[in-house]
């Protein structure tokens, strides 16, 4: 009975107000920059090429190499980002890229972005890093269930999530597939790991992926 009353109270409170939209100027991917780092992979089929990233640790290595190769821009989109070994490594390399002048755009769904508001605020201070949270919850909480309950008054938002996972470097190469940014997606968790695949993509498909990223980046959610 007590739990029922708590839920009812949360629904009543959250129904009193709506999430206020923030008007942001549209932004778009930059033109493809020179990327000699990938010449060996594009030689056979320069217009488009694919490389399967089946092994988790190798996929992480390719991801870090791609970030380190960036000279102009990185656009990263993910559903889940844990700041464990994997997530911290990716973030460290992204910050280093931004430090050398690369424009970094980060788009993360808000479902599991728990307890990281201070980190996001710190990233906001970097002149070359811009992040956006897709469909952010109005009422912040560090627990998944607590956040769901506190936002029951906006039920139409709860399951409107972004599951895309992509990283586009210099609008020349991209990594796209099923891996979120967490140890269990790269074979580094000591208890259990997911089995996922990705593609390292070059050529004309990258521009299509950039268009998709821009659509989500500029979306009102």
Question: Model-derived features: where do they sit?
Answer:
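Positively charged n-region of N-terminal signal peptides that target proteins for export
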Residues: 1-4
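Sec-dependent N-terminal signal peptides
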Residues: 6-8
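C-terminal motif of bacterial Sec signal peptides marking the signal peptidase cleavage site
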Residues: 12-15
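Bacterial signal peptide processing site
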Residues: 17-20
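Alpha-helical transmembrane signal-anchor/signal-peptide segments
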Residues: 22-32
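HKD-type phospholipase D/PLD-like phosphodiesterase module
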Residues: 32-70, 80-221
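Active-site microenvironments that recognize anionic phosphate/pyrophosphate groups
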Residues: 74
């Amino acid at each position: 009975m007590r739990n029922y009353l708590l839920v009812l109270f949360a629904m009543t409170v959250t129904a009193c107000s709506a999430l206020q939209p923030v008007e942001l100027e549209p932004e778009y991917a930059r033109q493809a920059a020179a990327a000699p780092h990938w010449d060996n992979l594009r030689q056979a089929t320069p217009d488009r090429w694919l490389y399967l990233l089946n092994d988790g640790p190798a996929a992480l290595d390719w991801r870090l190499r791609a970030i380190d190769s960036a000279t102009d821009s990185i656009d990263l989109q993910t559903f889940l980002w844990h700041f464990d070994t994997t997530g911290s490594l990716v973030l460290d390399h992204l910050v280093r890229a931004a430090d050398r002048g690369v424009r970094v755009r980060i788009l993360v769904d808000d479902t599991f972005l728990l307890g990281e508001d201070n980190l996001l605020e710190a990233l906001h201070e970097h002149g070359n890093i811009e992040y956006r949270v897709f469909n952010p919850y109005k009422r912040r909480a560090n627990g998944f269930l607590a956040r769901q309950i506190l936002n029951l008054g906006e039920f139409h938002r709860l399951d409107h999530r972004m599951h895309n996972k992509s990283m586009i470097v210099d609008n020349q190469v991209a990594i796209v597939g099923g891996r979120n940014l967490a140890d269990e997606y790269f074979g580094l968790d000591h208890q259990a790991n997911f089995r996922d695949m990705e593609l390292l993509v070059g050529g004309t498909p990258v521009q299509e992926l950039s268009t998709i990223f821009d659509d989500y980046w500029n979306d009102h959610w």
